Structures are given as C-alpha cells and as structure tokens.
C-alpha cells in the first residue's frame, strides 16, 4: 500500500506515463507549475507554452510515481530553511531527476538506496525535502538529508517533518505531525 496526497492549491498537474528503452515503465505525477515557474518572457516562455515541450519537460520533473517492478517513490517538502547541497566527488542530481532515475532503474528499496548513494543531491528549487520509498515486498523507508548526509529511516509513514534522530528531528508543520499520528494509529489498528 502506498498513498500520497497532492494538495497544492490551484496547480496544474499532469500524470506522466514513461516507457524507457532500458528501464522500468512507470506512472508519475508532476506539478506543472514547477516547470513554468519563473520562466519569464522570451523564447523560453514561448517554448514552455507548447504542450509538446511541457510534456517532454514533465518526464524529468516527477514528484512521485510507481514503476512496473512495484517501486514507489514520493518527495515531501519539509518546512525548514536548510537546503540539500551535497558536495563530494560524486555526480550531481536534483530532487526530481533523482525520482526519475529511481523510477527508471530501481526495482527495490535496496536498489533505490544504492542509486541515491552514487550521487550528490541538490534540492530542486532550493527546497528541503525527503523521500518516501517503498517496494513490492512491503519494505518502506524515508530518505532524509541532514547536514547534507543521507540518512535512511525504516518507516511505514512519512509526512512533512524530519524523522531522523538528532537536532532536526520533528522540524516541520504541526499539521504534518497530526497526519503522521493519525496514519500510524490507523496502520497499527489495521489487522495484517
């Protein structure tokens, strides 16, 4: 079971179906406002008014999705002024391109974690985020970046606050804590 809400107010959303030649087919959700935001005027603005160009760009801007192997991934924002800007000798990747990489190439949580560990992550649009990743075996983790270190937490639920132990734990909105508590209560009360 993997669920995610898409509660952006007044946004244009797109469901993207992908069938890469070398990788897993997937469905993903894209907030199209992220693609067209801050484009301005001129050639780029005119190009992004084309449905074909927006659809092509959407392929590389997923916020969540599931692939044919049963891997599901979602990005959740955390209300924090910190940003993810890893800086090692690994190749750079942004939040949304990381999701596309995982959907295309990872068939399990372990494979997803191995892939993420090969890159320096940079938060798209400077936002602090964490990932919910689950697979067909029922394994479910949160991947958080605290002080630019990747931390993996085994958890069946993720909302919009840090789960990792340490000084950041719990930072996020009160509403995200309420949703987390409600979901955990429901899960614990549901027979398996």
PLM feature segments, named:
Residues 1-59, 64-65, 69, 74-104, ...:
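C-terminal, well-structured catalytic/ligand-binding subdomain of enzymes
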Residues 109-120, 192:
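Short, well-structured alpha-helical segments that form the helix of a local strand-helix-strand
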């Amino acid at each position: 079971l993997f669920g995610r809400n898409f509660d952006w107010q007044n946004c244009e959303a797109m469901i993207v179906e992908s069938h890469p030649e070398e990788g897993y087919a997937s469905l993903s959700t894209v907030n199209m406002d992220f693609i067209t935001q801050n484009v301005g005027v001129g050639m780029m603005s005119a190009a992004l008014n084309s449905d074909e160009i927006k659809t092509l760009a959407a392929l590389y801007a997923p916020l969540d999705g599931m692939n044919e192997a049963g891997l599901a991934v979602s990005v959740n924002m955390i209300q924090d002024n910190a940003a993810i800007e890893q800086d090692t000798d690994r190749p750079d990747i942004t939040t949304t391109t990381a999701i596309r990489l995982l959907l295309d190439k990872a068939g399990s949580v372990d494979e997803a974690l191995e892939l993420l560990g090969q890159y320096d992550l940079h938060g798209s649009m400077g936002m602090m985020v964490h990932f919910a990743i689950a697979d067909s075996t029922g394994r479910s983790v949160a991947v958080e970046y605290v002080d630019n270190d990747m931390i993996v937490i085994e958890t069946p639920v993720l909302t919009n606050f840090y789960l990792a132990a340490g000084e950041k734990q719990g930072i996020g909105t009160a509403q995200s804590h309420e949703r987390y508590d409600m979901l955990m209560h429901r899960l614990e009360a549901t027979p398996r």
